[in-house]
Regions:
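Conserved S-adenosyl-L-methionine
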Residues: 74-84
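Polyanion-binding catalytic cores of nucleic-acid enzymes and NTP/SAM-utilizing transferases
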Residues: 312-410
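Conserved class I S-adenosyl-L-methionine
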Residues: 53-61
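Signature of N6-adenine DNA methyltransferases within the class I
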Residues: 24-25, 29-38, 61-69, 82, ...
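Short, conserved SAM-binding/catalytic segment
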Residues: 98-109
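S-adenosyl-L-methionine
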Residues: 1-47
């Protein structure tokens, strides 16, 4: 086995810390049914089945099989007869359960579900192609995926750096980054992929190489930033992208790439709806309300990265562009000119890890509490200490800086 393949396998199986629970170490956050249905519907609507005698479907991290079940269920009956389904996962129990689930529901469909590491598979195929004059790589017409979400702190800095080298990535690497690049290598020309990921790559420095790859190795069709919808139990802010396969690398561009975002609107009342994902079809700037009392602002526009292939992604609409122009005219300076800027804590961490009353909680003050700068501290040149005790926030932060990067506290 080559070193790249060994690396991919060890990264996906890594349990670096003895106290890290298996789902977190493996990144196995399974997909809610409504999100699986949403992604499957988008794939089927975008796919062109007319010229294909056989249709190969792939889930590279099959988990419990929910995504494949949703996708096959959405296919027209005449198409299902032409379908051959493939799924990989490093968890043997998950593979067995998914196989039983799918074969019972779709007895006429051929399933090839294997305990296999997808990254290892792609690297091996890539190395084999170097030794032959003609590519023997298996391509897939439809890919649906929710890749493992494992942060650098859990993978370990050394393995993350090796993954980056193997897949041509730069900076900090989360495990879903190489998954995205690997999907582009097995998606057939004119094939369709629908992928669920964290939305971190859209705005972080470490996501620069992934943003470029998405704009060069796919034909990106639509991006959904699902913001603080809290669709997952894990503290992950999800996103979905829909893309078409290409025959060769493209010049990076964002022309006509649709972009939808949904974020909670604290003070707005909106039209009532029972399904949070159904709100994604709302018009730009509409507010929708769901039964749990939350209200969401939906933005519909196009992807804007400022003309930079590695630039931060945002939704561009006529109203938002006018607002940004106004902000620009009244801007004294930007934070990046003053000091190094890091991404802040996601809103899903509020109330659980961020408090102003750590000294009063049962069991005493945790030893890993650190002071946190919030908007209440912000002022010109130097942060302030808020007058109100309730605004003096501290965060339970279980990581530390080391010579090789950030690491979890053991």
């Amino acid at each position: 086995m080559n070193s790249s393949a060994t690396l991919a396998e060890s990264s996906a199986r890594s349990h670096r810390y003895s106290d890290v629970e298996e789902p977190k170490a493996a990144g196995s956050t399974y997909t809610p049914e409504n999100l699986a249905d949403f992604v499957a519907t988008q794939i089927v609507n975008a796919a062109n089945f007319s010229t294909r005698k056989k249709i190969k479907v792939l889930d590279p991290a099959v988990g419990d099989g929910a995504l494949l079940e949703a996708l096959v269920s959405k296919l027209p009956e005449d198409i299902i007869r032409k379908v051959e389904v493939f799924g990989y996962d490093t968890n043997s129990i998950a593979v067995t359960n998914a196989r039983e689930r799918l074969e019972v529901k779709f007895p006429s469909v051929t399933f090839h579900l294997e305990e296999r590491n997808f990254l290892q598979y792609v690297l091996q195929e890539q190395n084999d192609d170097l030794l032959t004059q003609q590519s023997t790589k298996q391509l897939f017409d439809l890919v649906i995926a929710n890749p493992p979400y494992v942060r650098t702190q859990i993978i370990g800095a050394q393995q993350a750096q090796q993954l980056a080298k193997s897949f041509g990535l730069t900076g900090r690497v989360d495990l879903y980054y190489p998954f995205i690049l690997s999907i582009s290598k097995v998606l057939s020309p004119d094939g369709i992929a629908g992928v669920i990921t964290s939305n971190r790559f859209m705005t972080t420095k470490s996501g620069q190489s992934v943003r470029r790859a998405l704009l060069t190795q796919f034909e990106l069709l639509h991006v959904w930033d699902l913001g603080d919808t809290k669709l997952f139990d894990a503290a992950v802010l999800p996103s979905v992208f829909l893309a078409r396969g290409t025959t060769k690398h493209r010049t990076p561009h964002v022309v006509d790439v649709k972009y939808t975002s949904i974020y909670e609107a604290k003070s707005a009342e909106g039209t009532a709806t029972t399904d949070i994902l159904a709100t994604l079809s709302a018009r730009d700037s509409e507010v929708r309300s769901i039964p749990d009392g939350r209200h969401f602002l939906i933005r519909q526009g196009v992807l804007d990265n400022g003309g930079d292939p590695e630039g931060v992604w945002r939704v561009a609409t006529e109203t938002s562009d006018e607002w940004m122009d106004t902000v620009g005219r009244h801007t004294w300076d930007t934070f990046r000119r003053i000091g190094k800027i890091r991404v802040g804590v996601k809103s899903t961490a509020d109330k659980v890890f961020i408090r102003s009353d750590w000294d009063a909680i049962p069991g005493g003050r945790p030893e890993l509490v650190r002071p946190l700068i919030t908007r209440h501290c912000a002022q010109r040149f130097k942060s302030a200490i808020p007058d109100k005790p309730s605004q003096r926030k501290e965060i339970l932060y279980p990581h530390k800086s080391t010579e090789t990067g950030r690491a979890a506290v053991d």
